[in-house]
Amino acid sequence: MGITNLKTPCFILDEAELVRNIREFDTALHSKFNKSFIGYSVKTNALPYVLRLAKDNGCYAEVVSYHEYSLALKVGFDKRHIIYNGPLKSKSTFLQAVGDGALVNVENWREIEWLRDLPKDRCYGIGIRLNINISKISPEDAACDDDDSRFGFSFESGEFQQALKKISSIGNIDVVGLHSHREPKTRSVGFYRHVISYVANIVSQCQLHLDYWDLGGGFFGIMSGKPTYQQYVDGFYEALPTSLRDVTIVVEPGNAIVASAFDYRMEVIDVKHHDGKIYVCTDGTRNDVDPFFRKTDYFKDFVLTNPKERPLADLPQVISGLSCLEYDRLFQLPAGSVALTPGDIIVFHRVGAYTMALSPLFIHYFPNVYVSSPSGLLLIRKEWNENNFIIGNNY
């Protein structure tokens, strides 16, 4: 299948890019930590083909709900190669995961109570999530004056110590892991240094004996001018006390692994002139490439139908999407840019993270997804239709 024949809108996965990101991060980890691994953040992009590639390249599945836990098992992850985080664990999958030897990080009080229902004829190891307030721990990386967190147990409030005490009282449960994930706005190496120093002090005060430390995610991928995987790992190592350098180090990248591996293509379908602007309508939507509606520009290219015979636009061009929402506007080209016409293709790059996962079933259902592999371009998820939409419904 040729790229010019693809039905738009669509996503295209670069398989080689995804694998390269995983392997380069893994290589960086093992340059400092013999005991380390990547937990791929399933929520960032849960496309089954992506999950299979992550699994086949040595990643664990980092999941944050009972749905994601079941999905990870369904696509073939070893039951011991799952990191189970977040507040949306079900009791049955929580107990199953602990019993099967997955890395389960306790998030709240109800999960501690669930531990009491495990069989008493053996011992179990679990992790616990520590609350990270960026404003207090690394204020230069804070997004606001009070960059607190609703996740994990707070050491300052005493709830972390209370949680440890409750777990210890159960008798056959050991805290062997710590989860300290926060994603700073800056994604700086310095942030992770500060968090590691903060947490290491708590590990010492609470006399924890850790098998693993889950540092979470929030890293840049391979981008010019941004920290590299190696710089992050060097920062981890330098901040860790020597007494903790033999602990298994876990990272949970999502964006850093999958963002650069996806493009999104959409086609210009109509052009109108009014109110001092040119309105360019496409068959794509901002919902697919910027679901938080925060971006002001994108990594993008244009594939023009007749590039040599194209005039310049005398007015600004407003590039908009397929939906009926007025604010489905992606970006604006200034006057003097090449005038877009029907049939032109706009290609968005680095759109693999929190895009497909958050695309709504609004007006247009999920688009085609292709993979660019040594075998050529292959369809790996067919565009949804009304049959996909209504399955499971009674009407």
PLM region descriptions:
Residues 1-118, 122-124, 161, 168-174, ...:
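A charged N-terminal "starter" segment
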